[in-house]
Structure formats: C-alpha cells, structure tokens
Amino acid sequence: MNDENYSTTIYNRVQTERVYEDSDPAENGGPLYDEVHEDVRREDNLYVNELENQEYDSVAVYPVGRQGRTSASLQPETGEYVLPDEPYSKAQDPHPGEPTADEDISLEELLSPTKDHQSDSEEPQASDPEEPQASDPEEPQGPDPEEPQENGNEMEADLPSPSSFTIQNSRAFSTREISPTSYSADDVSEGNESASASPEINLFVKAGIDGESIGNCPFSQRLFMILWLKGVVFNVTTVDLKRKPADLHNLAPGTHPPFLTFNGDVKTDVNKIEEFLEETLTPEKYPRLAAKHRESNTAGIDIFVKFSAYIKNTKQQSNAALERGLTKALKKLDDYLNTPLPEEIDADTRGDDEKGSRRKFLDGDELTLADCNLLPKLHVVKIVAKKYRNYDFPAEMTGLWRYLKNAYARDEFTNTCAADSEIELAYADVAKRLSRS
C-alpha cells in the first residue's frame, strides 16, 4: 500500500463511516428538529441587524496586544491551506434532504436570552449556520457572573474527567468605570514594532449582564480568538445591547456586535471578516491560521443543531432519542480527533490500527480558524447541557476530552470565554423543562 492510498484510507474512516449516522428518526426530534434545522440553514435569519429599534449600553474599551507565544507558533507553515468559508457558506447543508418547516420557532428565538425577540428584516451580518443570534435582552434576574475559578493551565497532564474543567472569567477584562484596565497595548505587544506599522483594529463584542464584561456570543469569541492568535494589537469594546452611544450608532448603524473597524473601515460580516484577516495579516509578520485539511473545517458541524433540538425539547418521551443524536454527533468529532492526520503517519505506525492521533487540536498542534469556529460552540454545549439536562460529554470520548483539555490550557480560548453564569443565564428561558405530556 503506497503513501497516498494509506492516507486516503485513514481519512475515509472518518468521512465515509456510517456507524454513527442517525438511524432513528426520533433522534432528530421530529418537527422540532426540522424547525431548528431549517433555521440553521436559513442564515438570513441569524444575527438580524436590529440596532435601529434597540438601545445600547455604554461601552468599555480594552487594548489588547500580542501575548507571549513560542517562536514556533509565530513561524509560517508551509503547504496548502483551506479557508473554512466554503464549507460554511450559504450553500452548505450538513443534512441534505431534511424537510423544511414553518418559521414559528426561529433559531434566534431558540437561543436568545429573552422570549420577546424583535424580528427585523434588515440585512444579516453573520453567515455561520450554527450560532445563536444576539437579541435585545430583558433586565436579567440572576446571579452575578461567577468568580474566577481554576484555570485550565493548571490541569494535570493525564486525561481529565468530564467534571475537571472549570473556566475562569478573565481578569484581564475586568473594568473600572468603563475604562481600559489591567494592561495596555504597550505592555503586551512584542518586539519594537512601531504603532504606525501596525493596523488600527477595533473589535466590538457583546457585553455581559453587567454591561462591561464579555457576554455570551460565540460569534464575538470567534473573532476575538482570531485576532489574539494573529498577534496583532487591537482594542476590544464591549457593547451592552440595552443602550447605544451616538458615536457607536453612527459608526455601524443597524449592526449588532460583533463587528470591527480596520484602519477606519467598518466590517460586519463574521465570515468575511475572518477571510479578510487571514488574507491581510499574513506571514512573515503574522501567522497563518487556515487549516491545512478541509475535513478539519467541517468536523463537528452538526453538533450545535443536535444540541439545539435537545435543549429546546419539552417532551420527556423524546429526550432519550434527542440525547442519543447529540451523543452521536459528538462521537463523530471524537473519531476525527482520534484519527491520525496524514503527517502523523510514518512507517512505524502503518498497519497499526491502535495507533491513534495525539494531536492537540482539529488540524494539528496549533489552533486554527477551524478551532476558532468550533470551540466557542462546543463550550456552550458543554455548559448548557450540564446545567439544564445534567448531560456530560461521555468520558470514553478520549479524543474529545484531549481536545478540550488542550483548548482550556490556552489563554486565547479561556480568556475570551464568557463566564459560565453568563452562558447559563442566556439559556435560562431557552432550556425547557421536560414534561410527560
């Protein structure tokens, strides 16, 4: 068996294996799943721009710069890279042939912190098919965000148990009177690069319940992680959706966070922002983040829609089947993470089916754009499913837990996560109580 055929065989194990395909229609939740799935495909309903009829709170600005990284992580890699935009384009349908349904249950209603969500018809800004839409939240009635807990950096090297991960709310973004705090761009920028040589980047993200800290928004975290990994100096502004400063409204009228300005130009589409940053912030100065393997961009693509049907369900008799659907989606991701990439295969491992992958992330040992897209959603699923369904990711999914362990050990991920309490509160009205009716 030659090298090419062997590598192809390895990938076919993940791409063509049907063991974990949904054979039970009940796992799709019937009409509920169809309605959720229809909303996932209809990206025009996601992140509808409603700023004209909403108010923002005041904003908090934080300068962010390059964090300490190894020289290896800054070196551009060779080979072909695949941007994830194509797999997540509007033409992408992770489950072709699914019946469509009425739009009574929209994804923004499903995943919004409030029940009375406004639905405007202005141009959408985000085209990720699996993210919840930000909405105009009511005044929250819940606990304050959790205090910082044990950081993932302190985890032991052995395989963690499902309950061993707790995420701390980043101290780096605590605020005092809505002013820059904790560090400045000069403190964290590397080298002696002049300010004039670097682009001026301002990222606007959703604020938490206190109006200042980072809120629950996988879109925002996705862009936050990308900029951090690029090592570019940028400012982060948290925006509370209850009020709006006039200057922010004038900057991006009719636009929800996240969005950014790049040397004064406003950019609002998340996928296009990702593509722009990858094409603009290039080696040798900035690392390349696109995944080398196309399969990495689609790994875990159906997890969030399975989770949405599972958490929205109110019928006790449907719960087990929907839970199996989520578990199968997680298992497919686990299989991909345990399957060696072509570069992990050498003469010593060929023919050894027990020799699995040891890589840290989806596409290798460094975070890529694929991870920036998947990890924020995977974190939400983990927190919310445990809180409202007492569901833990199965301990036997060693690839999945290795992936999470390595992600929680990276500041680029943990310090851009919202507090667990923020995520739980956002889903308080979404997660429905099960009944026997």
From Swiss-Prot:
Organism: Bos taurus
Enzyme class: oxidoreductase
EC assignment: 1.8.-.-
Annotated control of activity: Inhibited by F-actin.
Alphabetized Pfam families for the sequence: CLIC-like_N, GST_C_2
Name of the protein: Chloride intracellular channel protein 5
Membrane-protein topology: Single-pass membrane protein
Known partners and oligomeric status: Component of a multimeric complex consisting of several cytoskeletal proteins, including actin, ezrin, alpha-actinin, gelsolin, and IQGAP1. Interacts with AKAP9. Interacts with TPRN. TPRN, CLIC5 and PTPQR form concentric rings at the base of stereocilia and may form a complex. Interacts with EZR, MYO6 and RDX; the proteins may work together as a complex to stabilize linkages between the plasma membrane and subjacent actin cytoskeleton at the stereocilium base.
Sequence segments annotated as region (Disordered): 1-197
Signal peptide feature range: none
Gene name linked to the record: CLIC5
Domain GST C-terminal, chain residue ranges per copy: 263-427
Taxonomic superkingdom: Eukaryota
Main location: Golgi
Entry's localization field: Golgi apparatus; Cytoplasm, Cytoskeleton, Microtubule organizing center, Centrosome; Cytoplasm, Cytoskeleton; Cytoplasm, Cell cortex
Reaction catalysed by this enzyme: Na(+)(in) = Na(+)(out); K(+)(in) = K(+)(out); chloride(in) = chloride(out)
Record-stated family: Belongs to the chloride channel CLIC family.
Biased composition (Polar residues): 1-14, 161-184
Sequence repeat windows: 118-125, 126-133, 134-141, 142-149
Coiled-coil annotated spans: none
Regions of compositional bias (Acidic residues) in chain numbering: 121-157
Keyword Phosphoprotein: yes
Modification after translation, per record: Phosphorylated.
Function recorded in the entry: In the soluble state, catalyzes glutaredoxin-like thiol disulfide exchange reactions with reduced glutathione as electron donor. Can insert into membranes and form non-selective ion channels almost equally permeable to Na(+), K(+) and Cl(-). Required for normal hearing. It is necessary for the formation of stereocilia in the inner ear and normal development of the organ of Corti. May play a role in the regulation of transepithelial ion absorption and secretion. Is required for the development and/or maintenance of the proper glomerular endothelial cell and podocyte architecture.
Motif (G-site): 217-220
One Gene Ontology molecular-function label: oxidoreductase activity
Keywords linked to the UniProt accession: Cell membrane, Cell projection, Chloride, Chloride channel, Cytoplasm, Cytoskeleton, Golgi apparatus, Hearing, Ion channel, Ion transport, Membrane, Mitochondrion, Oxidoreductase, Phosphoprotein, Repeat, Sensory transduction, Transmembrane, Transmembrane helix, Transport, Vision, Voltage-gated channel
